[in-house]
Amino acid sequence: MDEYLAKKYGSKPKKTKKRKLVEGLDVDTAPITQRQTQQAPPPPRAKGGWKTLSGKAIDPVEETVYRDASGNIISVDDQISVLQQRQQEKEAAERRKKENLLGAVQVEEARKRQAKEEAMKHTKVTVHADDKEYNEERQNRAIYADPAAKFGKATPKASTTSSGGALPSYTGSFPSNRFNIKPGCLWDGNDRSNGFEAKWLSRQEEMKRQADVDYQNEMDF
């Protein structure tokens, strides 16, 4: 009827709004949240990726399989832990090697320095004039060519080792020297001096022997 009247009188037909029913529910009158639940989820889109030689798509969640030279499957986590353990053993061996080259005093000083650095992590940064520990450290510190050092109290000598014993020394035979100093425990036995000590000792013995001869000659006369 509307189309007939439009053709006859030239008026446009009224557009009727069509309503869709989704499972007996009016779309225009349904709440928005209810409309979203009624809509079907979109189909998953095919994603591009790597494919095998046979054309089969590779699942991106599959883990890469690693093999060694003989073809056995290896675990990456196990290999990382083994490499870390080897690195730690190497660092420990190098640290022991460096400690063996040092004397007992140097090792003790390094240990005390490390303990002091660890203790400083929990100490306060600010230092006041009445700080007892800092004042004792400053007072016990030896100062070169201090003219007033002899008037103060005697500073306690640091122990040579942690147990208070003597330092290790060379147990074999060694060339004599004028100060009678024994070589260290790490000495390889090679005399690398220029021969001055031997000449000096020989000259001292010769002078002493000549003095004895002169004394005997004086007594004979």
Swiss-Prot record:
Residues 1-54, 113-174 are annotated as: Disordered. This is Pre-mRNA-splicing factor CWC26. InterPro entries: Bud13, CWC26_splicing_factor. PANTHER family: BUD13 HOMOLOG (PTHR31809:SF0). It is found in: Cytoplasm; Nucleus. Residues 157-174 have a biased composition (Polar residues). Keywords: Coiled coil, Cytoplasm, mRNA processing, mRNA splicing, Nucleus, Spliceosome. Belongs to the CWC26 family. Residues 76-124 form a coiled coil. It comes from the Eukaryota. Associated with the spliceosome. Pfam families: Bud13 (PF09736). It comes from Yarrowia lipolytica (strain CLIB 122 / E 150). Residues 9-20 have a biased composition (Basic residues). Its main location: cytoplasm. GO terms for biological process: mRNA splicing, via spliceosome. Residues 29-39 have a biased composition (Low complexity). Residues 113-140 have a biased composition (Basic and acidic residues). One of its GO terms (cellular component) is U2-type spliceosomal complex. Involved in pre-mRNA splicing.
